[in-house]
């Protein structure tokens, strides 16, 4: 398995690397895993991925619309949505997960983001993760941001943490 991070879709050599693996006949034995915001995803890359045993594409999104633009400047929300809908319609060997870095800038709004994701009625995004792990998947996957410390949710005042907790409890009942 190959885990590919740090802007793999920006690197021209990456596509050539995948083409070389395919030409040598190894692709059907190799699983790939990507972490990316996905905005540079091309049809050519998806075409190459169909040759591989499995591709897990983790899309880094931390909020919806304007909040995502603020956190992941200069992300264009329309581009993000286009990528998500394209990934939701890929062959079965390609699975997709929305990955959220929980932080001070988005923690309070994650229940709203979850409602937004659910409203999209994705057919396959995060579905494989739900089946594999029996928990955590289904809407999006989360991990905590610790560095830089000034963005960590741990810096929030206790009153803010309680308000956020209440929003999550309300969402749980939703």
What are the language-model segments listed below?
Residues 21, 84-87, 91, 117:
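Hydrophobic positions in alpha-helices of CheY-like receiver
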Residues 17, 80-83, 113:
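Alpha-helical packing segments of well-folded alpha/beta enzyme cores
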Residues 1, 5-12, 24-43, 50-82, ...:
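Core AdoMet radical
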Residues 47-54, 88-91, 121:
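Acidic (Asp/Glu)-rich catalytic clusters
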Residues 13-19, 43-49, 109-111:
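Distinct, well-ordered alpha-helical segments
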Residues 1, 17-18, 22-23, 28, ...:
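Eukaryote-biased activation of long, low-complexity terminal tails and linkers
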Residues 104-121:
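Catalytic cores of alpha/beta
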Residues 119-174:
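C-terminal accessory regions of radical SAM enzymes
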């Amino acid at each position: 398995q190959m885990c590919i991070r740090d802007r793999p879709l920006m690197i021209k050599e990456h596509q050539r690397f995948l083409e070389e693996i395919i030409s040598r006949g190894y692709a059907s034995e190799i699983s790939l895993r990507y972490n990316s915001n996905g905005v540079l995803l091309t049809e050519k890359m998806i075409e190459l991925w169909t040759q591989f045993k499995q591709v897990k594409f983790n899309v880094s999104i931390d909020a919806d619309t304007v909040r995502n633009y603020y956190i992941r400047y200069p992300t264009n929300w329309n581009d993000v949505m286009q990528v998500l809908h394209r990934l939701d319609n890929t062959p079965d060997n390609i699975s997709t997960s929305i990955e959220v870095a929980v932080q001070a800038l988005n923690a309070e709004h994650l229940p709203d983001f979850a409602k937004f994701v659910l409203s999209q009625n994705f057919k396959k995004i995060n579905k494989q993760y739900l089946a594999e792990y029996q928990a955590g998947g289904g809407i999006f996957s989360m991990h905590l941001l610790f560095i830089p410390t000034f963005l960590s949710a741990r810096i929030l005042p206790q009153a803010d943490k309680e308000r956020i907790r209440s929003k999550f409890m309300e969402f749980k009942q939703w």
